[in-house]
Every structure is written in C-alpha cells, then in structure tokens.
C-alpha cells in the first residue's frame, strides 16, 4: 500500500469510526479464512462490518473520534467490528466468539464510552433497538386489548342472560 492509499484508507476508516454506534476490537489469531468469511457475512447480515487494518493505521484513524479511548487495544493481530446500531457489532462478535475460541474479544467503544471485554459481553446481552421497539408496541397494545375485552364482556353477558330468559319463557 503506498502513501496515498494509506491516507485514503485512514480517512475512510475514520469516517466509519465516527458514524458507528459501537466498535469492537478482537484478536483473530488462528482463525481460518473460512471462519473469517463467516464472521464477515454474519456481521454484514446484521448490518455491521468487519475490517482487518494495520494497527498503526487504525490508531491514526481513531484520532478525533469519540472512540479514541480504545487506541491501546490495537496490539497484535486485531480485527475491528463496527455497526451503526450500538448492539449489533457486540452481539454478533460475542456470539461468534462463543462458537470460535480463536476470536478473543479485547474490548470496544460505544460512543465516548470505552468498554473492556466484559463490557462488550454485557452490551451484547442487551436487546437490540428493534427488539425494544417490538416490546414497547406489545406493552402499549396489551392494555387496549384488555380494555376491549372488559368493555365487550358485560354486553356479552347481558345478551346471554336475555337469551336464556327468552328460552325459558318459550319453554314455559
């Protein structure tokens, strides 16, 4: 990679760090090409990205971003996972690390907050934004459904009583 390509890559990576909701840094020593491709496809399907970058270039790209606190994590063979949704990158990375012990999560960042490996795992256990929206809609709909049942139940009971009374009068 010549200097112009490096500058372009650093600028692109800097933009990715600025736009991302969360960043996860991990060691990938020992992962096969197939496993790395699997990680990339899972992350892509979830709406995130995975990049392997030279540590020096990644450190330069982090300058001026909220995630600047994770500069110290870039030692050895590191891979960077990031996504706009704060939960996506940690969730996919942690799930993949459970299945492949060669991927070792070092830490990450969510906005200006620096996370250690346990922090990333805790973040991964939270529900995603879509899951939270679904729960909220369910919570809002439940009282309305109960109210509809409660208001229609007395009318149904009255109709049954009148129907029974009518049958009783017909039989008599």
From Swiss-Prot:
InterPro entries: Ribosomal_uL10, Ribosomal_uL10-like_sf, Ribosomal_uL10_bac, Ribosomal_uL10_bac_type, Ribosomal_uL10_CS_bac. GO terms for biological process: translation. PROSITE patterns: RIBOSOMAL_L10. The keyword Lipoprotein does not apply. Keywords: Ribonucleoprotein, Ribosomal protein, RNA-binding, rRNA-binding. One of its GO terms (molecular function) is structural constituent of ribosome. One of its GO terms (cellular component) is large ribosomal subunit. It comes from the Bacteria. The keyword Nucleotidyltransferase does not apply. Belongs to the universal ribosomal protein uL10 family. Forms part of the ribosomal stalk, playing a central role in the interaction of the ribosome with GTP-bound translation factors. Part of the ribosomal stalk of the 50S ribosomal subunit. The N-terminus interacts with L11 and the large rRNA to form the base of the stalk. The C-terminus forms an elongated spine to which L12 dimers bind in a sequential fashion forming a multimeric L10(L12)X complex. This is Large ribosomal subunit protein uL10. It comes from Brucella abortus biovar 1 (strain 9-941). The gene is rplJ.
């Amino acid at each position: 990679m010549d200097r112009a390509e490096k500058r372009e890559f650093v600028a692109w990576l800097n933009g990715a760090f600025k736009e991302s909701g969360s960043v996860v840094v991990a060691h990938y020593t020992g992962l096969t090409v197939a496993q790395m491709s699997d990680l990339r496809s899972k992350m892509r399907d979830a709406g995130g990205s995975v990049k392997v970058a030279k540590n020096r270039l990644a450190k330069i790209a982090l300058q001026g971003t909220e995630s600047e606190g994770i500069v110290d994590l870039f030692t050895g063979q590191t891979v960077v996972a990031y996504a706009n949704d704060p939960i996506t990158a940690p969730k996919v990375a942690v799930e993949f690390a459970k299945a492949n012990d060669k991927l070792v999560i070092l830490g990450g960042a969510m906005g200006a907050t620096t996370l250690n490996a346990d922090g990333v795992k805790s973040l991964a256990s939270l529900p995603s934004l879509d899951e939270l929206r679904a729960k909220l809609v369910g919570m809002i709909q439940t009282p309305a459904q109960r109210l509809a049942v409660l208001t229609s139940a007395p009318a149904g009971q009255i109709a049954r009583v009148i129907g029974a009374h009518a049958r009783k009068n017909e039989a008599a």
